[in-house]
UniProtKB/Swiss-Prot annotation:
It comes from Burkholderia cenocepacia (strain ATCC BAA-245 / DSM 16553 / LMG 16656 / NCTC 13227 / J2315 / CF5610). The lineage of its organism: Bacteria, Pseudomonadati, Pseudomonadota, Betaproteobacteria, Burkholderiales. This is 3-phosphoshikimate 1-carboxyvinyltransferase. Catalyzes the transfer of the enolpyruvyl moiety of phosphoenolpyruvate (PEP) to the 5-hydroxyl of shikimate-3-phosphate (S3P) to produce enolpyruvyl shikimate-3-phosphate and inorganic phosphate. HAMAP family: EPSP_synth. Keywords: Amino-acid biosynthesis, Aromatic amino acid biosynthesis, Cytoplasm, Transferase.
Amino acid sequence: MDYLDLGPYSSASGTVRLPGSKSISNRVLLLAALAEGETTITNLLDSDDTRVMLDALGKLGVKLARDGDTCVVTGTRGAFTAKTADLFLGNAGTAVRPLTAALAVNGGDYRVHGVPRMHERPIGDLVDGLRQIGAQIDYELNEGYPPLRIKPATISVDAPIRVRGDVSSQFLTALLMTLPLVKAKDGRTVVEVDGELISKPYIDITIRLMARFGVTVERDGWQRFVVPAGVRYRSPGRIMVEGDASSASYFLAAGALGGGPLRVEGVGRASIQGDVGFANALMQMGANVTMGDDWIDVRGIGHDHGKLEPIDMDFNLIPDAAMTIAVAALFANGTSTLRNIASWRVKETDRIAAMATELRKVGAIVEEGPDYLVVTPPAKLTPNAAIDTYDDHRMAMCFSLVSLGGVPVRINDPKCVGKTFPDYFDRFAALAKA
């Protein structure tokens, strides 16, 4: 097995420029592909998840010209030209969910599949929503999960569409992005959400990006959304992808744990991503955080000089960045509780189980619940722990922070960070100091 040994490190400081946001990159690629006109996307993330989206769009007949982190997309005016395609989408939820919806109304015959873990990640709530407007979608193996066969269908909207919001916000995102392509009798489509909508900031990203492409979604709280029907996305001409706020969390935590000062560039006050809220969680734990429009500075205590404060917080709004808090809790002076994180169970791996298992390897006492995690740090971290990463990029990046506790740590299968941040460990090593 491939592995990477890190540390021991005693401090972390410097400046890091973030790669483009995965969530924004894949949304913008699909919107640009469906739009009228040519869109130049800058600071586009280059990672496994964006590559599978680009590959799929190419197979669907979208004209793409890539040069470094810039991509010029020639829009299809709402309909992909390829009416048959076999699309492999890896483990990219940000690709498989929105593309499934767009393909369901495109009038073609498509197969959508991915890696084995993708075939364990639920998609049934989205399929149920699409079937309400006439979509013809079959499950190849297990009911409610990919692989999917999508067939030509007569699509019509004559009643509000209902979709569950308590498993993944990507189901609602997929519907919102696709419904402008579908005609409705009164020129609009209503989507009603069943249950508590999780990850609300990601829906906000979707709505803001749709507006950049000329389509305005109205919402009544987080339970009812009104989408213009039978309209066309229009290219904004040029759009820049802001830095990835989830990826920022590892460096911000490094600054807090390793003393700093550490500056992250590419996200800040002006960010449309909810995960910038991670900075507030760090502040609650005692880190010193300042923020500009597109940068965040953090100074911490350094493990030799003190401890972070424990935290007890609802992380429903920022579940991805919350993983970083679970590891930062190793450096607190008491027990921390992460609440309302049930969505971790259906991510790249069962992140609650995985996080509990790996935190115990470095000496923590962990209580694992259906939607919560309680972490009591050890008096001293266990050196040379071999951390399994479960083909989950965030597990690998989170546990790099253990090395700032003055102990070496081994990260198994470090290449899994390629999903969102291929050169993460090089960037981390440039900031961490022995």
